[in-house]
Amino acid sequence: MSKDYFIGLMSGTSMDGVDAVLVQFSQGEATLVERHSQAIPKHTLSGLQRLCLPGSDEITRLGQLDRSVGLLFASAVNALLEKAGVSKEQVVAIGSHGQTVRHMPNLDMGFTLQIGDPNTIAVETGIDVIADFRRKDIALGGQGAPLVPAFHQQMFSKPDTNRIILNIGGISNVTYLPGNSQAVVGFDTGPGNTLIDAWIQQVKHEAYDKDGAWAASGETDEKLLMYLLSHSYFSMGFPKSTGRELFNQAWLEQQTAAFGHLSEADIQSTLLDVTCHSIAKDVLTLSADGELFVCGGGAFNRELMSRLHNLLPSYQIDSTASLGMNPQWVEGIAFAWLAMRHNQGLSGNLPAVTGASREAVLGSLFPAA
């Protein structure tokens, strides 16, 4: 029985579910064999959202959620294998990103923390797990993020063509793939779906703004837009990365407190423009024109995509589906790829992207045995 599959597990800052993908790699190409998305139970989601903000008794909650998320990830793997009709013996390793609960690389003693106990995943699935991908890069002086640009470079580069891969999850990040010999560049541009999700959850108790319809029904307030975009993160040079520690519901409430005269739909429209304008500014800083391919949940937001087209008329914009990779599963495939790189003793980071002092093999091995 051949053993040539890798599994990627990803749950992003939007916490909208666990993505599990079964992947085969051959001659530098990735084939998505099967995929599975598993919802995060409400009590686990509530605990994770609380843990992402300062509070009391965090260590006990952290320890328990670490196990709970590990069990959830393992359940996603087992469901994936059953759906694919593939046995655990055929899988080389699982690459698990985990669930980020803190990402603070710019402190004097910078750190990042993802939970979802890889020991639990290994025991519950019977498959070796490679996890903790980000902390080696931080130990080397880097941001620990974004890590997907190395994967984007291998899968999506095209000679003589400037390409940008834009991932819009909870946070948006870009990878610039120049068509010449320039170094690849990648960084977080700022909020992706996190603010528009937080606002619709607070006001309408809906998980997300389907197709951006609510935002489309409102009018952007230029004063609020400029106020939000004046945050220092948007003017920082790269490498840079961010997360829910900064752009969260508490921050949103504080920033919009003086704008109570606006309608709720107008605020939603303005928040969507924060995402789109911050992306467009950084994209144009990287290159005046080229091809832009979108992945992540934002690729399915019709209003968001329309606004990007309007802000970036010199770019050809499409989703990564046009490159043969479903935008929903790109990050999961990337962590299967990082597991494969670890297994082969190959580096997974790009120092030009993260600011690390050198390339390194990322992740730690947690054997099932």
Curated annotation (Swiss-Prot):
Pathway: Amino-sugar metabolism; 1,6-anhydro-N-acetylmuramate degradation; Cell wall biogenesis; peptidoglycan recycling. Its EC number is 2.7.1.170. ATP binds at G12, T13, S14, M15, D16, G17, V18, D19. One of its GO terms (biological process) is 1,6-anhydro-N-acetyl-beta-muramic acid catabolic process. InterPro entries: Anhydro_N_Ac-Mur_kinase, ATPase_NBD. It comes from the Bacteria. Pfam families: AnmK. Catalyzes the specific phosphorylation of 1,6-anhydro-N-acetylmuramic acid (anhMurNAc) with the simultaneous cleavage of the 1,6-anhydro ring, generating MurNAc-6-P. Is required for the utilization of anhMurNAc either imported from the medium or derived from its own cell wall murein, and thus plays a role in cell wall recycling. Belongs to the anhydro-N-acetylmuramic acid kinase family. This is Anhydro-N-acetylmuramic acid kinase. It comes from Shewanella woodyi (strain ATCC 51908 / MS32).
